[in-house]
Amino acid sequence: WQYRERISESIRSRTPYKNDIAVRVSQVPEFLHKIEQLVGMSYPDFEIVWFGHIGDGNLHLNILKPAELMAEQFKKQCEQVNDSILLVVQEFGGSVSAEHGIGLLKKGQLRFSRSDKEIDSLKLIKAIFDPDGIMNPGKLL
């Protein structure tokens, strides 16, 4: 377990761009291959480190910054490929947030794994319990 816990620490110096995604366990091999191809075609110098909870399809995708690339440029390039990654998640019927929730950062990404009707239902549920929008402002639930 210590090895798993230290993965994030071991790649921290490489400024990882992170995603917390999930697909069905039976789809994991094909999904990994497709994402590796997608990122490799767009940015062949990017290294990917995968870890997570493979037994339930929860995958932590970490794209590592090449040493010669400035952090701002790396982030911009990762953001450019991120929607394509999320389209693959959508294609596989996966989730854009496997275990860490949606929050403010991933709110715009929810459309890749939930329908408009489902998102509207979440908003409706929140409005029932928080009609004035004072609890968890800006969040769906």
Model-derived regions, located:
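A structural signal for short, well-ordered beta-strand segments
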Residues: N19, L61-I63, H100, I125, ...
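Generic secondary-structure boundary signal with a strong preference for alpha-helix termini
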Residues: L64, L69, L105, S113-S115
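Activity-critical C-terminal alpha-helical subdomain
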Residues: K107-L141
